[in-house]
Curated annotation (Swiss-Prot):
GO molecular function: ATP binding; P-type potassium transmembrane transporter activity
Species classification: Bacteria, Pseudomonadati, Pseudomonadota, Alphaproteobacteria, Hyphomicrobiales
Membrane-crossing segments per the record: 7-27
Complex formation: The system is composed of three essential subunits: KdpA, KdpB and KdpC.
Membrane topology, as annotated: Single-pass membrane protein
Provenance organism: Methylocella silvestris (strain DSM 15510 / CIP 108128 / LMG 27833 / NCIMB 13906 / BL2)
Role: Part of the high-affinity ATP-driven potassium transport (or Kdp) system, which catalyzes the hydrolysis of ATP coupled with the electrogenic transport of potassium into the cytoplasm. This subunit acts as a catalytic chaperone that increases the ATP-binding affinity of the ATP-hydrolyzing subunit KdpB by the formation of a transient KdpB/KdpC/ATP ternary complex.
Pfam family of the protein (one): KdpC
Compartment(s): Cell inner membrane
GO cellular component: plasma membrane
Family: Belongs to the KdpC family.
PANTHER family: POTASSIUM-TRANSPORTING ATPASE C CHAIN (PTHR30042), POTASSIUM-TRANSPORTING ATPASE KDPC SUBUNIT (PTHR30042:SF2)
Keywords: ATP-binding, Cell inner membrane, Cell membrane, Ion transport, Membrane, Nucleotide-binding, Potassium, Potassium transport, Transmembrane, Transmembrane helix, Transport
Name of protein: Potassium-transporting ATPase KdpC subunit
Length: 200
């Protein structure tokens, strides 16, 4: 019986070392050598302090900042552990709402958000990414159209000209990967940090 168990135990130990230690350390080493910023989480620092990651959105609510996409992430309700409560951009619980297009809760939320945005900028159609959540709930990017839609509100709150803000948005548009993959996008955190650095 020991002769039968021994090979199985050897394989468990061998593959535990191989897949649990050697492979992760090797991949981390390769990532740090080839993509040092990405291997550390694409962290953004200002004055020696980490202010966020270029890969994870943040919940900006002040009129002085550009807002990201709605986030459907949640956290445990402190009053009832069997329930959850909204916690926008909670990276510990990344997920979409899983509500289908005919779900009344989703329809009501989108209508409410769209009406609030339309009141903010009645002359422009509301970009779809300002009322829809991403699959992860942590999307750090907006379409250039969604960022430009918010220019009047941010300009008014900061006392800046709309033209200056449009230029700032244009400077922060990231193109398609390799010229063909994905869509042009704006990283909301990078744009808001540039706003703060403008001094107004």
């Amino acid at each position: 019986m020991i002769a039968q168990i021994r090979p199985a135990l050897v394989m468990i130990v061998l593959f535990t070392i191989l897949t649990g230690l050697i492979y992760p350390l090797a991949m981390t080493g390769v990532a740090k050598a080839l993509f040092p910023a990405a291997a550390e989480g694409s962290l953004i620092t200002r004055n020696g302090q980490v202010v966020g990651s270029a890969l994870i959105g943040q919940n900006f609510t002040s009129d002085r900042y550009f807002h990201g996409r709605p986030s459907a992430t949640t956290t445990a309700d402190p009053n009832d552990a069997s329930k959850t409560i909204p916690a926008p951009y909670n990276a510990a619980n990344s997920a979409g709402s899983n509500l289908g297009p005919t779900n009344s809760a989703l329809i009501d939320r989108v209508k409410t958000d769209a009406e609030a945005l339309k009141a903010e900028n009645p002359s422009q159609p509301v970009p779809i990414d300002l009322v829809t959540t991403s699959g992860s709930g942590l999307d750090p990017h907006l379409s250039p159209e969604a960022a430009l839609f918010q220019v009047p509100r941010v300009a008014k709150a900061r006392g800046l000209s709309e033209d200056a803000l449009r230029r700032l948005v244009s400077e922060h548009v990231e193109g398609r990967l390799l010229g063909v993959l994905g869509e042009p996008r704006v990283n909301v955190l990078a744009l808001n940090l540039a706003l703060d650095e403008s001094g107004k």
